[in-house]
Amino acid sequence: MKYNRVIPGVFLKRPNRFIAHVCINGKEEVCHVKNTGRCKELLVPGCTVYCAVSDNPNRKTKFDLIAVEKKVENHEGDADQNTTASDDKNALLANHKNEFETDTVLLINMDSQAPNAAVKEWLASGASPFGQIDLLKPECSHGNSRFDFYLECNKRKIFIEVKGVTLEDDGVVLFPDAPTERGVKHVHELIQCHGEGYETYILFVVQMERARYFTPNRKTHPEFADALYEAKQAGVELLAYMCTVSPDEMKLDKPLKIKL
């Protein structure tokens, strides 16, 4: 999936989960954050972010914050890891070059709507493991459940639930980044659908280009990790895919190993 106009900026602060203050072209702008999650490990004052320009003149905010460069620690000399970020905008901008531009960075798309859009393109293109699809229905209801995708191909009937992954720790990517009762509910509903004869998949879309493997975040939400293991045992298929990511585009790329 592709964005029309994207420009870089320097993240300053996030007063609430909906907006962030970003320095764009030397001016402090209020941007809509397209991810209501905590994202504290991503939105570090002074980091480089990327914002899509909105074409809607009636919006309160002109920009959508969609991607961020995360500094990847090399574990050699951790002395500057504990540097306290100043609340002063000028200090943040002055530190930006020294702290971020000289380190290895990982570009992460943090738009919570991007995974479903990218998966829809991937499925429709015929490049997925499902091949050519006869019927593709996003946001499909089934009983009391609602799944991200329903598809039919070669007489197969398939439900897919998509989860976007932005949390990375030393090359390991994890989901969720916060407790998700809704996520547990989705897993149990897929187990039920599998029992009814449908093929069922949970697809973790890793919104970055580099990772060693995916694993459920048991420390943050053990119930989700347990539900995922139960689903695997019941026959629900688990998939994880890395993406190619640029400031203005994200596409599904290579499968990634899963460790439960």
Which role does the model predict for each range below?
Residues 13, 53-58:
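Short, charged beta-turn/beta-strand-edge "cap" motif at the junction between a beta-strand
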Residues 29-39:
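Short alpha-helix capping/helix-loop boundary micro-motifs
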